[in-house]
Amino acid sequence: WWIGFLLFTIVGERLELSQFLPVPSWSQNALKSLLALFTVGLIVPFHAWGNEIMGISALLIAAWLLVFDMAKVASRKAAQFRYIGIGLQVGYLWLGIHGLILMGLGNHSLSYALILHTFFLGFTFSMIWAHAPIIFPTIFGIRQTPYHPVLWITWTGFQLSLLGRIVSSILDEYELRKVLGVANGYLILIQFVLMAGIIIGKIMKGGTSSQSGNKIYREGRKKILH
């Protein structure tokens, strides 16, 4: 149910933003139908096709987001907007991998870990990293955005270590899985520390601003779209 809550929250926000793009109405209805199908999968027991229903719906939701979401627009821009766009698209790929695991690896000895890690680490944390440059100023009421090109280093390390963690789990390489799991956890902490350091550095360098976080969010969204 936590997976369902986060999925509906994130996808609902992306669906709302899609109104600013020329997205056909049929595709929006299709996404709503896929979310309804995912809900059915949550209700049906996992041993009675529940996992498979959630898996196929998660895979198709990921495909919808890759095709229709504004991330494809942002990824063609520069600096932080490229970071946001690529981060979102990678998150959607993780959602697709999550769906594939639900459909095909339900009997694996580490299936529970694979399901949790692909969703909560792969999909959810990718969403956090991608939204941070616009959402964090809104949350903390500041103008400074937590973006610097150095974030690409830890972001890439996080994604690669998580991918290695998933592959080593599937192959039952427990020692490698353990090492990559520790690295993955530290990279999450480092990413947050870097973001905090970037904000503090920008505040000390340029001072505070009276511009509200909500205004930053609105301007950021406009820049992504135009």
Kindly give the residue locations of the regions a language model identified.
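Hydrophobic alpha-helical transmembrane segments of multi-pass integral membrane proteins
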Residues: W1-H226
